[in-house]
């Protein structure tokens, strides 16, 4: 795959072209470890799918107001090594936030990021970071359109349960910055969710 040839809708140079390798590039931050184990990948995928099915079955009582309506077109996600590679390249820059260009040949790619820190030498399990995204459901108003909700409060949740998204792949890095032990998780989603003129899923 020649990522340097991919033209993203938002412009910019593709992350996998710009940085080009899995070598961490974190300046004065001390890298402890990077990458996800096979088990962690399975756990992250299972957490996404368990949550999507909880929403689909109408079992999510949280919301503003809750509960969330059940879905009729919510499929399970599958893991994508390609999306995971691009997510890992971005995570390895130790820059919290979204990269500009991460699309792949077949579709636009969405992204969720999470960062936790502790003064103690402990690092949160990646599933805990995924649950932080799920918790945004408490601010979601299902009686309003997606575009009428406050995106800054709910955007990670909505990407997680976006029905048209089929694949997910994530990357992770743990590093120390000014005595803070940080765990940074990046998940990429394809096809991307969070389109302003669409809805999360079809309600039953």
UniProtKB/Swiss-Prot annotation:
Expressed by the venom gland. Keywords: Allergen, Disulfide bond, Secreted. Disulfide bonds join 4-17, 8-101, 26-94, 170-187. InterPro entries: Allrgn_V5/Tpx1_CS (IPR018244), CAP_dom (IPR014044), CAP_sf (IPR035940), CRISP-related (IPR001283), V5_allergen-like (IPR002413). Residues 45-189 form the SCP domain. One of its GO terms (cellular component) is extracellular region. It is found in: Secreted. Its main location: secreted. Belongs to the CRISP family. Venom allergen 5-like subfamily. This is Venom allergen 5. It comes from Vespula maculifrons.
């Amino acid at each position: 795959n020649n990522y340097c040839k991919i033209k993203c809708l938002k412009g910019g140079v593709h992350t996998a072209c710009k940085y080009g390798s899995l070598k961490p590039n974190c300046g004065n931050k001390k890298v402890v470890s990077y990458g996800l184990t096979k088990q962690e990948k399975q756990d992250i995928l299972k957490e996404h799918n368990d949550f999507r099915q909880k929403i689909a079955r109408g079992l999510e009582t949280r919301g503003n107001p809750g509960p969330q309506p059940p879905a009729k077109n919510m499929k399970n996600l599958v893991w994508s090594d390609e999306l995971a590679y691009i997510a890992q390249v971005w995570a390895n820059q130790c820059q919290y936030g979204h990269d500009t260009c991460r699309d792949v040949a077949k579709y636009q790619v969405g992204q969720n990021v999470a960062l936790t820190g502790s003064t103690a030498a402990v690092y949160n399990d990646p599933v805990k970071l995924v649950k932080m995204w799920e918790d945004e459901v408490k601010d979601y108003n299902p009686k309003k359109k997606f575009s009428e909700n406050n995106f800054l409060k709910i955007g990670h949740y909505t990407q997680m349960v976006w029905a048209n998204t089929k694949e997910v792949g994530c990357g992770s890095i743990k590093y120390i910055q000014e005595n803070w032990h940080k765990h940074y998780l990046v998940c990429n989603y394809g096809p991307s969710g969070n389109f302003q003129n669409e809805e999360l899923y079809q309600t039953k």
